[in-house]
From Swiss-Prot:
Disulfide bonds: none annotated. It comes from Rattus norvegicus (Rat). The chain crosses the membrane at residues 4-24, 48-68, 76-96, 137-157, 176-196, 203-223, 249-269, 279-299, 334-354, 363-383, 401-421, 431-451. Residues 856-867 have a biased composition (Polar residues). The lineage of its organism: Eukaryota, Metazoa, Chordata, Craniata, Vertebrata. This is Sodium/hydrogen exchanger 5. Residues 660-692, 801-888 are annotated as: Disordered. InterPro entries: Cation/H_exchanger_CPA1 (IPR018422), Cation/H_exchanger_TM (IPR006153), Na/H_exchanger_3/5 (IPR018410), NaH_exchanger (IPR004709). Residues 1-3, 69-75, 158-175, 224-248, 300-333, 384-400, 452-898 are cytoplasmic. GO terms for biological process: potassium ion transmembrane transport; proton transmembrane transport; regulation of intracellular pH; sodium ion import across plasma membrane; sodium ion transmembrane transport; sodium ion transport. One of its GO terms (cellular component) is neuron spine. It is found in: Cell membrane; Recycling endosome membrane; Cell projection, Dendritic spine membrane; Synaptic cell membrane.
Length: 898
């Protein structure tokens, strides 16, 4: 368009349009050098990059204009609109410049425009769906392409022999076979452009799209073999040449796949060591993938197959190694390049069709080619599908076969190949070019416009893409293992057997070699779900100011909700309560209004809940990392501090943990720490009392202090933040060390004020008399308490705390309650328990002295009888730990040192 605008301006020469080079200023009459020019037009120096940028800009603006109307894009595919736009632009250029200026050059197409599209297709291809249908894809790609090429070429040659093609079309059998090889291949660019807008089901899409990618090897081999035979002449072709042609099919296809896998291995291995240079990770992905394409093209192998296998093989390991920002950059950059290249290709196809000097028309050849490619495509799909359905578990029905036959689109690959023909060797090149343009336009425009109504009319199953839930993934993996086990049992090495063997090999060798160790946590799907749930919970927690605020939490229970000072005075309160007391005027308190008090309470809540960042970040510029902005750093710090405070608050409230930063004080000489084991010498022969919650062995929780936190490194990127690490250790090990960490002290825990009764205590008053129950946990479960299991561990402790009764190391001194009501006046006589060695549960005697009436006691008897089997210790192995020196007990203290 820039050239068109420049051509309309008189006096401005344009390079490449018939204009000469930039005129040089001649010296003056006396031979003096020219003076300093204030302005010089240097178009020839920036012509190439400027035109590239201009074409991409025009293509992007065209896509924006097309999508302004949803009705237009829903009826007409985007590829059709781009071809029509190219025809319009080409006509304008031809009318102004009197000749076609731009064409789709084969070198530009194969080296610059095609690689981004194929890389995007291979990198984001669903690998599981691709390998599940690999047999059908290879059948349609290899057998189907060979069938279409030979049948189309032979049929066109027969059409010429029958006299339906003009005699001026000078072509023999080898020429028609060459034309059939380039016109029979399904184009991946056209298939992607049309089928992504139709949204057919996943199986149908992956078969057609996989065929368009993998048939490149067959197309390249057939094109090169037939072109070589044409150059040699039919009289000079030997039998060994045919054998070489068959062998080259395997060399080109397998060689291209091998090149792609080698570069995929190198790419995955390289990204394993980019932890400290994250900024170059997206660059490595594109460079090595493009190097795979160029290497295969240099060795005359299948470049499309090479870059497809490179993207398909490296994605799993690259996604695990690179950072989240790099993954986002790779995704959007790859999609942008592919979309831009596809847009430019279809526009250039439309512009190239305007130049009538490059093609010649023959109606018989054009119509015959259109009929034969449609007929033999449908016939080949029906025959191959009938064979495949004999072995497929889910057969392809007739509707799928109709869509596959109608979806064989041709595109820019066929046009680029026909342009590469040598006119001296192939005299009918101009007729082949015209026929190819008509076939491409017919398949992209006519079939692209009608395939969506056809799919709706046939009621083809559409794709319902959604991210599988954890339950679906679990069942899918379960079925895979079951089917692999069945094949292993019957001795049949089928698809599931080999897939299971590959997964074991990948887990044992490839993942260990190509992934860094920190990537294994990312691969864990359960951990990923847990992490996302935790992040969502934390975000909602931070949004509430760090506290779970509610309407009840915004006011104090003792604060009256008043509106003025007069309503909140002491006299007014006494008057409302009906008190007869007379207060002196000097002692009447001046109470602020309820709104002022609510504002004060809200101020304290916000000051205690909101967190002001303490870290000072210096502005830095790094070549290896993308530094976070101030808001990102502040949000991250607020999130970490709120989560840490929340965990500390939860631990201290639930399990009576006391965190202190002072140094441990020396213990007095006569002071003895309470143990959870009954010592006969200390009790002087008296029966030991029940073990309480305060008397069990303590678990030392190592928590990072604030001073250590403030001295952390202020690097711009610190990704692996493990948070708080709780370390459970035995009391004996801590006491043997002789000292405790400076951030924690061991001290006796004072009694705390009992909280308000819960619902269970209101319904079952005997529970409130138990005090702090000792929770015993098996030693096997408390030796290792992972950080990611803290939540389940705490819930288990809470369950034991609410259900379990206090175990006894010796026979208890309390008796089982009788079924009849208790009499408060009768004294409790200790019962000799020597005859009953079993440990049993007994309701505390405080209930008998509570002063309850007989009716209240009788009402609680059914509840006690229902709960009595639950609270009795029939199995001592689960709740009673036995001797304390061989078991691990846990105690959380509040308000004191552990």
């Amino acid at each position: 368009m820039l050239r068109v605008a420049l051509l309309l301006l008189p006096g401005l020469p344009l390079a490449g349009v018939g204009a000469t080079e930039e005129p040089t200023q001649e010296p003056g009459p006396l031979g003096e050098p020219p003076g300093l020019a204030l302005f010089r037009w240097q178009w020839h120096e920036v012509e190439a990059p400027y035109l590239v940028a201009l074409w991409i800009l025009v293509a992007s603006l065209a896509k924006i204009v097309f999508h302004l109307s949803r009705k237009v894009t829903s009826l007409v595919p985007e590829s059709c609109l781009l071809i029509l736009l190219g025809l319009a632009l080409g006509g304008i250029v031809l009318a102004v410049a009197k000749k076609a200026e731009y064409q789709l050059e084969p070198g530009t197409f194969f080296l610059f425009l095609l690689p981004p599209i194929v890389l995007d297709s291979g990198y984001f291809m669903p690998s599981r769906l691709f390998f599940d249908n690999l047999g059908a894809i290879l059948t349609y790609a290899v057998v189907g392409t060979l069938w279409n090429a030979f049948t189309t070429g032979v049929a066109l040659w027969g059409l010429q022999q029958a006299g339906l093609v003009a005699p001026r079309v000078q072509a023999g059998l080898l020429d028609f076979l060459l034309f059939g090889s380039l016109i029979s291949a399904v184009d991946p660019v056209a298939v992607l452009a049309v089928f992504e807008e139709v949204h057919v089901n996943e199986t149908l899409f992956i078969i057609v799209f996989g065929e368009s990618l993998l048939n490149d090897a067959v197309t390249v081999v057939l094109y090169k073999v037939c072109n070589s035979f044409v150059e040699m002449g039919s009289a000079n072709v030997q039998a060994t040449d045919y054998l070489k042609g068959v062998a080259s099919l395997f060399v080109v296809s397998l060689g291209g796949a091998a090149v792609g896998l080698v570069f995929a291995f190198l790419l995955a291995l390289t990204t394993r060591f980019t932890k400290r240079v994250r900024i170059i990770e997206p660059l490595l992905v594109f460079l090595l993938a493009y190097a795979a394409y160029l290497t295969a093209e240099m060795a005359s192998l299948s470049a499309i197959l090479a870059v497809t296998m490179c993207g398909l093989g490296c994605k799993k390991y690259v996604e695990a190694n690179i950072s989240h920002k790099s993954r986002t950059a790779v995704k959007y950059t790859m999609k942008t390049l592919a979309s831009s290249a596809e847009t430019v290709i279809f526009m250039l196809l439309g512009i190239s069709a305007v130049d009538s000097s490059k093609w010649a028309w023959d109606s018989g050849l054009v119509l015959g080619t259109l009929f034969f490619i449609l007929f033999f495509r449908a016939l080949g799909v029906v025959l191959q599908t009938w064979v495949l359905n004999q072995f497929r578990l889910v057969p392809l029905d007739k509707i799928d076969q109709v869509v596959m036959s109608y979806g064989g689109l041709r595109g820019a690959v066929a046009f680029a190949l026909v342009i590469l023909l040598d006119r001296t060797k192939v005299p009918a090149k101009d007729y082949f070019v015209a026929t190819t343009i008509v076939v491409v336009f017919f398949t992209v425009i006519v079939q692209g416009l009608t395939i969506k109504p056809l799919v709706k009319w046939l009621r083809v199953k559409r794709s319902d893409y959604h991210k599988p839930t954890l339950n679906q993934e679990l069942h899918e993996h379960t079925f895979d293992h079951i089917l692999a086990a069945v094949e292993d049992v019957v001795g049949h090495h089928g698809y599931h057997y080999w897939r299971d063997r590959w997964e074991q090999f990948d887990k044992k060798y490839l993942s260990q070699l190509l992934m860094r160790r920190s990537a294994y946590r990312i691969r864990d799907q359960i951990w990923d779900v847990y992490y996302r749930l935790n992040i969502r919970d934390a975000i909602s927690f931070v949004d509430q100011g760090g506290h779970v605020l509610s309407s009840a939490g915004l006011t104090l229970p003792s604060m009256p909700s008043r509106n003025s000072v007069a309503e909140t005075s002491v006299t007014n309160l006494l008057r409302e309560s009906g008190s007869g007391a007379c207060l002196d005027l000097q002692v009447i308190d001046t109470v602020r209004s309820g709104r002022d008090r609510e504002d004060a309470v809200m101020h304290h809540l916000l000051c205690g809940g909101l967190y002001k960042p303490r870290r000072r970040y210096k502005a830095s510029c790094s070549r290896h990392f993308i530094s976070e902005d101030a808001q990102e750093r502040q949000d991250k710090e607020v999130f970490q501090q709120n989560m840490k405070r929340r965990l500390e608050s939860f631990k201290s409230t639930k399990h009576n943990i006391c965190f202190t930063k002072s140094k441990p004080r020396p213990r007095k000489t006569g002071h003895k720490k309470k143990d959870g084991v009954a010592n006969p010498e200390a009790t002087n022969g008296k029966p030991p009392r029940d073990l309480g919650f305060q008397d069990t062995a303590a678990v030392i929780l190592t928590v990072e202090s604030e001073e250590e936190e403030e001295s952390e490194s202020s690097e711009t990127e610190k990704e692996d933040d493990e948070g708080i690490i709780f370390v459970a250790r035995a009391t004996s090990e801590v006491l043997q060390e002789g000292k405790v960490s400076g951030s924690l002290e061991v001290c006796p825990s004072p009694r705390i004020i009992p909280p308000s009764p819960t619902c269970a205590e209101k319904e079952l008053p005997w529970k409130s008399g138990q005090g702090d129950l000792a929770v015993y946990v098996s030693s096997e479960t408390t030796k290792i308490v992972p950080v990611d299991m803290q939540t389940g561990w705490n819930q288990s402790i809470s369950s034991l705390e609410s259900l379990a009764s206090p175990p006894c190391t010796q026979p208890p001194t309390l008796t089982r309650l009788p079924p009849h009501p208790l009499v408060p006046e009768e004294p409790q006589v200790p019962l000799d328990l020597s005859s009953d060695p079993r440990s049993s549960f007994a309701f505390p005697p405080s209930l008998a002295k509570a002063g309850r009436s007989r009716s209240e006691s009788s009402a609680d008897i059914p509840q006690q009888q229902e709960l009595q089997p639950l609270m009795g210790h029939k199995d001592h192995t689960h709740l009673s730990p036995g001797p304390a020196n061989s078991h691990w007990c846990i105690q959380f203290n509040r308000g004191g040192r552990l």
